[in-house]
Amino acid sequence: MKSYYIYTYGCQMNTADSERLSHQLESVGYTPTEDVETADLILLNTCAVRENAETKVYGRIGELMRLKRKNKNLILAVTGCMAQKNQAEMFKRAPHIDIVLGTHNIQHINEMIEEVQRGHTHQINVDMDNSVLPELEAKPNGTFYAWVPIMNGCNKFCTYCIVPHVRGREISRPVEAIVKEVTELGAKGFKEITLLGQNVNSYGLDFKDGTDFGTLVDALDGIPGIERIRYMTSHPQDMTKSMIDALGRSSNIVTHLHLPIQSGSDRILKKMNRHYTVEHYKELLSYCREKIKDVVVTTDIIVGFPGETEEDFQATLQLLKDVRYDMAYTFIYSKRSGTPAATMDDQVPEEVKRVRLQTLMDVQNEISYELNKPMEGQVFDIIVEGPSPRDEDMWFGRTSGNKMVLFPKDDSLSIGETVPSYIDKAQTWVCYGTIQKG
């Protein structure tokens, strides 16, 4: 029996792609193995968002040369954004790679494996056909949750981001296909799904028939078995009031909204090519808080973008204080070759970036704690996810708003079970609770 092992790097879209690759491999007789040493096929699904991600992948590919020497029939395949970006260069850097597969081509994995088995090594397919998004069945790794891609690509071209260059232009799956997949997942016992897209708010715009993300949200409402629908990532430019209305009236869309701002300075937002102002963003967020009951808002922020002055940074700090996010994912700007920002003047010194990041985190951590504290004494439904990675005597689950709740291990509970939890103590990043029974 042939076996396979997949390394998955990067975002949730890559995780979803790996699940679809798994299904294709198993359809022709491969079985998964947890021991990479015994695999007949090793596939690396890669990320190119940051340079250190590529460094990790090339390091792993180098380590795998030992297994290729030991097993001359071992097939080594590389797919994902790094494969799309570097293409044939990968064979030059690592000649022991057999297959390079682009972001639009995972449906061809089995035929490329057959070619390698016939002796035709160095197979490559990185064509970016934006005319159709193939419907591929997945093998979800989760027991109660599943990733559901609704589109691929991005049309935004933020000046710091490589994604449009490696994922291509936006192309959406038909509403009917997504509804069918989610309905089947609900029938199989999955109760939480996450809708995936580089920019879910531009979903359906390529159809040019009025279909948008709100249309999809309405179509997914009330599907049997599906308790929670999460979605990521949103872009403020394409978010509309009608979409927000759909999110607010849905019975299974979660209360968590992740809406990246990236900077609190209009000048920097323009340099980033984000196509919105801070004022427009605040108006959107105000409408979200009006229409989505108990909404929990998180964001992404980049500090040290080229040309960011102290005044720009202070504007970002003020935005945090004005908006009061439940959590902010903060990043130091790092150059990405192939993007306009990498060659911009006025690159910010690394030490300045580090100081700004710490200042930002200090302000946000205080806000996060202040927003979590009122949860104490309240009861929230959580879905049990399993043992805490840091403490085997504690389990954890998440609220609809994506707040993590830790509670004492309870063998009477099952992973995927929805239970009420009384919040005993709230901290900056997590809450501690007691499961309510009876």
Which ranges hold each PLM region?
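Short flexible coil/turn linkers enriched for glycine and charged/polar residues
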Residues: 141-144, 154-156, 253, 263, ...
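Radical SAM enzyme [4Fe-4S]-AdoMet core and its adjacent flexible, acidic
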Residues: 11, 204-221, 225, 272, ...
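Proteins enriched for Cys/Gly/acidic motifs involved in redox and nucleic-acid/cofactor modification
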Residues: 1-203, 242, 257, 279-290, ...
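Terminal RNA-binding accessory module
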Residues: 343-438
